[in-house]
């Protein structure tokens, strides 16, 4: 029985008579059955990788699974023949609220590639019921509300497996739910998500407020609960320990069921620690092994040979460090092991910068990972060099053999085959259909660089995608885009280092320029998508400024035909899948040396956008691949920025005082026009922040940014030359396939 026959059998009625909800439920169950029929990926070497991460931003799964199972076209045609539109069926599916930003999206891409490459490897995380939060805009400000996603019809499968997890004053019993991870034309792996039996969504009050002390009911409610107070920090520790204790118990259970000796755990298991949230897996595994009769020395050796750590940040504040008294309050049974690990380091090394426990009695999670793991990797070439030579230099001096680079990647199944089908049709027409299995085949598109017909068709594909975005946003939110404008897009977490505030200053510059009578040749539409962490005040202030500008421009008849600002509400994977194919100018403007890699830059590039960015993260490698003519680079280099920090010689106020243009743009934030729309206190806060602090050097780069952006828009008018830039970017994007990244992880670290 083929997939279509199974679908109709599961549905139990004629497709034409079924509702979209009924068809979605039948498709989901048929996909689950087909994934099981594909069978698990099994390692020939008897080794398995477990990828532990606090977040997995997996996006909607229906279409991705249909593509990976090789039945998408079959299902689409079957539905169409019965008067149904697969796109409408897709809209029934809720997006899982299991991630936030690039960290979680990378984890999702990696699981897709691990399965596609036929490697035996599963993800381990938590089953958050309400996600990060659902973002709504009220009074030009972000408001957080719960984001429930779990329905009776769900990709989650109750495994019947659970473990007891001990805390200081009580223990919790877990429930394990699995989500199938289908490989493209390959076997199936699993994403294991642990939950508590006693979770209670009803304890959430106004917005996303809840009793942070009620661990028995709140533990798996929210991803990254507000940690601006002690209760929030303790809840984070409860969450992290619950995740790693379940993960460690599950891993040992699988090993014992396979008949492996736990004395040889490292021969059969590799645990990839994705950022510092899962770091307690190291002492927890040691605890579980010693409880089974293995000596402390041997347990430490086994765990060190089993665990590998991926560093995702250059920001010191993101490298977690927990006060000892907090850990004693939550997991006192781990502290003797952590103290033992710290004592062994202290006995060998005098340098205070490598100690696991610092002079303020805080436990540094990343330091524990580096001492008691066998691999430390960065996620872009520049990032890894900064780790080795600056941020983590004391560790590189001790363990040079542990450090390696694994430049991030994205899955082309979702970020091309699923979300940009018109571009895929164009690619197939011009002979690179093999990219589905070998992304390097995209280079074959360079043969069309002087083919005017192909270039015009490529421009037409982009225009169709812009029109599709216009129709989608108008239907979803009532916002009407001008699809004849240039689409300039910045979508990513709202953080000062990503410098959405610099984009704001460009908008102000352009607004004032238009008011002075200088109309652009072509209208410009600036699109933002971003959530700010609930306790991150400055980030929320920046959103307020963007929304005020959106309102100001919309209601100014002199400016509205030429300049538009749109901030999409509740930016998520589904929205990204609409925005990325329509983007023409990709904003990657973080302060050089601060973005570890970025993957949005790769998605935009793959879909034919041209990058406007700093020499930061993976932008450096994009620049190397496409050449100077096909990317727009501005701003000071990472070396220059690092030197500014070392010398403390950047003073934002000097730029504000000495440059009348910068002063004019910054002061516009508190102009009568803005104060009429916005909250006075909020606008004053962000105005003062830019002048008095500006930790991420917005005013240092803003003039170069504006000049470079104006050059981008001027070059856009030569449509054939622009189309050639698009082709080069698409053709060179093959390097950024997560299949390549995972192949390198397996070659150098996992050996599955």
Annotate each language-model stretch with its function:
Residues 1-752:
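A conserved ligand/cofactor-binding region detector
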